[in-house]
Amino acid sequence: MFTPYGMSTLVKLAAVSVGTLLFSILLPLQAAIPVGSAAAIFLIFSLWFFRDPNRSLPPGKGIVIAPADGTVMSIKACSHPFTGNGSSIISIFMSPLNVHVNRIPVTGTVTLLQHHPGSFSMAFDEKSGEENERMEIGIESNGMKLHFTQVAGFLARRIVCPLSLNEPVTAGKRFGMIKFGSRVDIVIPAGWLPEVKRGAKTRAGETIIARLATTAGNG
């Protein structure tokens, strides 16, 4: 299936690809082959990029699920205004080949939602989390506060986030996407331990990226 968050873009890209394919028929064979091939490859990439596969939420309590497909870039200790001292930030880089639909990491209520305009530096640049265009999201769940940020990158210049303040959300629920490569930063509070390491691959809605310290080692 394809994500509704990118359907308008997908339709436009598909129209351009199909139009180019039809135009290539009118060209001499020597030119038609490369033009038609390029259009076909572009169409296949567009369909692949906006795919939205189903995911199976892992069982268990006291867990945080990856909000994005990608590769863990870094895990660092931090102090954050939403989650407090003793927090940890996990950064996930999403390449253009990853599924770009984002999913809610914990069940709870959205209590923070703030969009920041900014630049479009490479997503793997550490400064991009503070300087690039981004959407901050905070969820409160049974006294626990979790913060995560959709960060636009050099290619990803469109953040989609239809969430609303005070909206109840469920772990694994689709909540938006970042188009064409980007990153997601997740801040977990003190008392929660990262379950992934740098370089690990994540799948949104399936990979456990953090666990409550009292349950660590039980999953």
Swiss-Prot record:
Keywords: Cell membrane, Decarboxylase, Lipid biosynthesis, Lipid metabolism, Lyase, Membrane, Phospholipid biosynthesis, Phospholipid metabolism, Pyruvate, Zymogen
Domain of life, per lineage: Bacteria
Cofactor: how and how many bound: Binds 1 pyruvoyl group covalently per subunit.
Keyword Lyase: yes
A single GO molecular function term of this UniProt record: phosphatidylserine decarboxylase activity
GO annotations of cellular component type: plasma membrane
Cofactor: pyruvate
Name of the featured protein: Phosphatidylserine decarboxylase proenzyme
Ranges in coiled-coil conformation: none
Quaternary state and interactors: Heterodimer of a large membrane-associated beta subunit and a small pyruvoyl-containing alpha subunit.
Residues bearing the modification Pyruvic acid (Ser): S182
Catalyzed reactions per annotation: a 1,2-diacyl-sn-glycero-3-phospho-L-serine + H(+) = a 1,2-diacyl-sn-glycero-3-phosphoethanolamine + CO2
Species annotation: Chlorobium phaeovibrioides (strain DSM 265 / 1930) (Prosthecochloris vibrioformis (strain DSM 265))
Bilayer disposition of the protein: Peripheral membrane protein
UniProt-listed NCBIfam families: PRK05305.2-2, PRK05305.2-5
